[in-house]
Amino acid sequence: PGAVLTDVGSVKQSVIDAVGPHVPEGVHFIPGHPLAGTEHSGPESGFATLFRDRWWLLTPLPGTDEAAQARLLALIRGMGARTDTMDPAHHDLVLAVTSHAPHLIAYTMVGVADHLSRVTETEVINYSAAGFRDFTRIAASDPTMWRDVFLHNREATLDILGRFTEELFMLQRAIRMGDGPLLHDYFGRTRAIRRGIIDAGQDTAAPDFGRAQRADGKPDG
């Protein structure tokens, strides 16, 4: 009794539905999600600054014990993370935008390159420009984990993919019609959003997504 139970999964509502009914009386279940990590998995992929200045979201349930939540927050902040709280369903929608859909799109882009018969696998590997390398880096992520993420955050992911498809069709029409002003305006607006991510301290303007490689091969920061 009095123990605090949390998790670090990328989907919250399904975890609450699955775990919540089985939490023993007196145990404080406070779901969480650190927005940190790389495309690599397992304990060997950890490093000392993994959580430094990264957001760690908590999705506490109604009636969560304030003292228990304070203890968990102290632990998280002690690892250098920033904290915030969020409704579980809203968390899943936000992460569908910022993480889940981007991973699925990255997997798809690699799949397109793999199935394009006029471009060989060797050419894709040898001549990858920075855009392809940077954009598809996350396609190296663990397939088992991401299969489960998509299946357990199905509705939010499908919602965002539908919106993405509409935007893509709009850009497709603009390119087909030679609508340069529309493209320039669109890219300008989205560029400003990207700069906002840097200004918020969630990345840097340095190459390689702001993760310079250290001598041991792990990302620095």
Locations of the language-model features?
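NAD(P)-dependent dehydrogenase/reductase Rossmann-like domain
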Residues: 167-168, 172-221
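Short, solvent-exposed amphipathic alpha-helical segments in soluble enzyme
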Residues: 20, 47, 73-78, 189
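Interdomain hinge/lid region at the active-site interface
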Residues: 121-190
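Glycine-rich beta-alpha junction loops
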Residues: 12, 33-39, 62-63, 89-90, ...
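Rossmann-like NAD(P)(H) cofactor-binding subdomain of soluble oxidoreductases
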Residues: 1-44
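Internal alpha-helical scaffold of NAD(P)-dependent oxidoreductase catalytic cores
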Residues: 50-137
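Active-site capping/gating segments
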Residues: 26-68
